[in-house]
Amino acid sequence: MSISQDDILNAVAEMSVLQVVELIKAFEEKFGVSAAAASAGPAVAAVAAEEQTEFNVMLLEAGEKKVNVIKAVRELTGLGLKEAKAVVDGAPAQVLEAVSKDAADKAKAVLEEAGAKVELK
């Protein structure tokens, strides 16, 4: 005996909401699937990237002017000499976390002027 798709849809249309929820749970258990909507993938990531309001400033490498980069890190973060040196020596390292676009751009400019390679995330 074969049941058509229309027969199934008509049967579901006659069910109460509670019965439909129970049917969905039964499908999930029987077939090992989830009724959750599939993620939209890269399109969602692109929208999120456009809406980003907070940035992390990442020091990728100090370059040849390490002393100037340490001074720039101290200026931007308020860290002591030892702590700033540890950040620079530990590159790649996060210099600033969750700052505005303007602050991140200014920090990047200061660090690059000092000779560092910098990335905003």
UniProtKB/Swiss-Prot annotation:
The keyword Ribosomal protein applies. GO terms for cellular component: cytosolic large ribosomal subunit. GO terms for molecular function: mRNA binding; structural constituent of ribosome. Keywords: Ribonucleoprotein, Ribosomal protein. It holds the Pfam family Ribosomal_L12_N. One of its GO terms (biological process) is translation. Homodimer. Part of the ribosomal stalk of the 50S ribosomal subunit. Forms a multimeric L10(L12)X complex, where L10 forms an elongated spine to which 2 to 4 L12 dimers bind in a sequential fashion. Binds GTP-bound translation factors. Belongs to the bacterial ribosomal protein bL12 family. Forms part of the ribosomal stalk which helps the ribosome interact with GTP-bound translation factors. Is thus essential for accurate translation. HAMAP family: Ribosomal_bL12. This is Large ribosomal subunit protein bL12. It comes from Pseudomonas fluorescens (strain SBW25). The gene is rplL.
